[in-house]
Amino acid sequence: MAKIKARDLRGKKKEELLKQLDDLKVELSQLRVAKVTGGAASKLSKIRVVRKSIARVLTVINQTQKENLRKFYKGKKYKPLDLRPKKTRALRRRLNKHEEGLRTKKQQRKDRLFSARKFAVKA
């Protein structure tokens, strides 16, 4: 098999990708047998290409799977940990905009009764 491009793989369905993955794994095992039995140099150099192709297929499968999960959980209240934004531990625990703006009943009353003073500037 020739070198596989990731952009060609993205259009394929999951079943096709899994079938291609199986084919590549079979080919890799055949190449490894050829290596042990003393195969041609062209077959030995092909091992690397097939390994990288397997990695590309697996990468595309995992990326599409994660993309579909993101679509599924979009707008839901709870998301799996690996779909949430990473950030730092401190940033994840920080109050959000809504929580920062909240005031107690007592503070709301104080703000209402003693509003900010406005001063006129003498020209």
Curated annotation (Swiss-Prot):
What PROSITE patterns does the record point to?
RIBOSOMAL_L29
Entry's Gene Ontology cellular component terms? cytosolic large ribosomal subunit
Q: What InterPro entries does the record point to? A: Ribosomal_uL29 (IPR001854), Ribosomal_uL29_CS (IPR018254), Ribosomal_uL29_euk (IPR045059), Ribosomal_uL29_sf (IPR036049)
Subcellular localization, as worded in the UniProt entry: Cytoplasm
Q: What are the GO BP annotations of this UniProt entry?
A: maturation of LSU-rRNA from tricistronic rRNA transcript (SSU-rRNA, 5.8S rRNA, LSU-rRNA); translation
Instruction: Tell me the protein family, please.
Output: Belongs to the universal ribosomal protein uL29 family.
What is said about its interaction partners and assembly? Component of the large ribosomal subunit.
Write down what this protein is called. Large ribosomal subunit protein uL29
